[in-house]
Amino acid sequence: MRIKMLPIVAAAVLVAGTASAQDMVVKIGHVGPTSGAIAHLGKDNENGARMAIDVLNAKGVMIGGKKAKFELLAEDDAGDPKQGTSAAQKLVDSKVNGVIGHL
């Protein structure tokens, strides 16, 4: 599980490494089908991301000497490319540090 979380932590270090607050918030976006014909796949993927973030937050990950709090912002793309584009744009507008998903 550590190896699978390494890319998320590495991305967070690169993007959030210069934050000035005592505790920094690292926003991770997730886009996947949580409705529609393949909703079960998107929900499983999102639940896995939530579990990984819970583990990171429980461990108290430090980035650049500051405690990092990870947050998951999730959007439903219903397995539709147009909705996927819109969902991804919402996450960009929310200034997420990285995005996972898009099955």
Where are the model-predicted features located?
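Beta-alpha junction/loop-to-helix N-cap segments that form part of ligand/metal-binding clefts
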Residues: 25, 40-45, 59-103
